[in-house]
């Protein structure tokens, strides 16, 4: 508990003393999969962003499609922070209850957790004093640890003793973040 308080204090101290933007992804939000984040200055050309993407829904076929993605990311801006091109590197985590694309015509789905390591490229354009647009795309490698179930009975169907494992190279983030400067 003490460590959490110290980390929270340090984080909010940095945020309160630097340029900080809160963000929402216009594209994913229109698709009812909100992606929100916060980006703050940590150096002359460096920023740190933390964002969360969440799907709370089932698919249009009524199959499991819930997932949560948590991504902390370091960003290097080539021109100046919050203006122009940047590259980012991130490590993130996932929680999912999902039917993968190759199981669409079956009764199978997976529940699991995972981690990802990847990169982002983007361009930020200031549009008003406190607003900017952040155009970005990113992806990387996702390693998943899951258990397979039947949708109809919720019975476990895989043969793994503990968890199945899988890894994929995926584009898993992108869009247009509408950003508002807090200070």
Name what the model sees in each region.
Residues 40-135, 180-182:
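Gram-negative (and chloroplast) outer-membrane scaffold detector with strong preference
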Residues 1-21, 178, 182:
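Bacterial Sec-dependent N-terminal signal peptides
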Residues 36, 100-101, 146-149:
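Short aromatic-enriched loop/helix-cap "lid" or pocket-rim segments at secondary-structure transitions
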Residues 19-21, 56, 101-106, 156-163:
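Extracytoplasmic loops and strand-loop junctions of Gram-negative outer membrane beta-barrel proteins
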Residues 21-36, 59-66:
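Solvent-exposed loop/turn segments connecting transmembrane beta-strands
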Residues 137-150:
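Short, solvent-exposed beta-strand-terminating loops
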Residues 77, 168-183:
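Outer-membrane beta-barrel "beta-signal"
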Residues 42-44, 151, 155:
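Short alpha-helical hairpin
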């Amino acid at each position: 508990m003490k460590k959490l308080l110290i980390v929270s204090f340090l984080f909010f101290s940095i945020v309160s003393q630097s340029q900080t933007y809160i963000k929402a992804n216009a594209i994913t939000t229109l698709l009812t999969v909100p992606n929100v984040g916060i980006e703050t200055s940590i150096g002359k050309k460096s920023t740190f962003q933390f964002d969360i993407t969440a799907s709370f829904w089932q698919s249009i076929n009524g199959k499991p499609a819930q997932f949560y993605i948590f991504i902390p990311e370091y960003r290097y801006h080539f021109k100046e922070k919050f203006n122009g091109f940047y590259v980012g590197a991130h490590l993130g985590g996932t929680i999912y209850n999902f039917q993968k694309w190759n199981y669409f015509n079956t009764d199978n789905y997976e529940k699991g957790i995972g981690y990802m390591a990847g990169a982002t490229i983007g361009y930020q354009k200031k549009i008003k004093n406190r607003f900017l647009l952040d155009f970005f795309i990113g992806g990387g490698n996702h390693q998943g640890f899951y258990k397979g179930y039947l949708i109809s009975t919720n019975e476990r169907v895989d043969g793994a003793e503990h968890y199945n494992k899988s890894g994929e190279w995926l584009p898993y983030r992108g869009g247009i973040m509408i950003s508002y400067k807090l200070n």
